[in-house]
Amino acid sequence: MPVSLLDDFLAYTLAGTRPAASEAQGTCAGGVRWSWLDDGVLLMEPAVQEEGMRSVLVSAGVHGDETAPIELLAFLVRDIAHGTAALTGRLLVILGNVDAMRDACRYRDDDLNRLFSGRHLQLPQSHEAPRAAALERAATRFFAAAPDNPGARWHIDMHTAIRASAFEQFALLPHTGKPFSRAMFEWLGEARISAVLLHTTRGNTYSHFTAQACGALACTLELGKVRPFGQNDLTRFAGADHAVRHLLAGMRGEVRAPMPRAFTVIDQITRQSEAFELLVAPDVANFTPFAKDTVLARDGDYRYVVRHDEERLVFPNATVKPGLRAGLMVIETTQDTLSKLV
């Protein structure tokens, strides 16, 4: 067994090492079976596989410069391999944009997290397009072998944000046309996530793909700020790390924590041309509230004006390519959302 693969999956991946066929799978502590499937893709399965057990995909590095969750995943692999973290279900570990990770950048040509659900087919020349297709295939194959039972398929996609936030750690749930899951909200509470953004239209993120195409309970976690490898204070991510490990150990639900607040997307600001202006401070924090009638953006004849008594701006980015989202507008819907969980 190539010890370095499991002891430091991050370093192994950054080095671009590809194991020989005879060294691409094996058994580690507790009889856990592992298989290296692709660059940055590792499957781990318990020795005893029970009917109905969870299949959990945990991904990080879909943006190559979001290093803290990548480091957390490397430590998780090491701890499972050494038997200090329990695994009672199937686990697929994915480090997303490995080339961008090696270059210490967010992406090379295009944002990988906007290329899923087949959108990569529209950008065949993009460096990220083949990786998006490969990650779709990896998720599809993984979940195809999982029971199609409620709560049996999970996808946790971990990120860090470019900017500060009124809620330092928050989650985004994809739109599937179905009611949102109480089990997911309870797990997010255990992860110490303080706010959840609820999408109202289908998107092209990895969690949207796994929710829609694979039937997974999927979420995107935003866990803090972007920092270089080795400069993260991982204690700040202890809540999410602990909750992921509990999920993999089959212990979810044993810790009761406050439910996160819910915010529903009601509109988006789109950059339509090079004349686009986002009329907020460059360092405005995610979830900053704005009062009714505030003009937040303009682009030729286009204006975005706040319509509700209060709307909050999330993911403002004035430098995206024309045609892409320059910000999401949300309103708080906590009481209504929590009353409708299933």
UniProtKB/Swiss-Prot annotation:
One of its GO terms (molecular function) is zinc ion binding. One of its GO terms (biological process) is arginine catabolic process to glutamate. Keywords: Arginine metabolism, Hydrolase, Metal-binding, Zinc. It is an enzyme of class 3 (hydrolase). Its EC number is 3.5.1.96. The active site is at 222. Binds 1 zinc ion per subunit. It catalyses: N-succinyl-L-glutamate + H2O = L-glutamate + succinate. Pathway: Amino-acid degradation; L-arginine degradation via AST pathway; L-glutamate and succinate from L-arginine: step 5/5. InterPro entries: AspA/AstE_fam, AstE_AspA_cat, Aste_AspA_hybrid_dom, SuccinylGlu_desuccinylase. Zn(2+) binds at residues 63, 66, 159. Its cofactor is Zn(2+). Pfam families: AstE_AspA_cat, AstE_AspA_hybrid. Transforms N(2)-succinylglutamate into succinate and glutamate. PANTHER family: ASPARTOACYLASE, SUCCINYLGLUTAMATE DESUCCINYLASE. NCBIfam families: arg_catab_astE, PRK05324.1. Belongs to the AspA/AstE family. Succinylglutamate desuccinylase subfamily. This is Succinylglutamate desuccinylase. It comes from Paraburkholderia xenovorans (strain LB400).
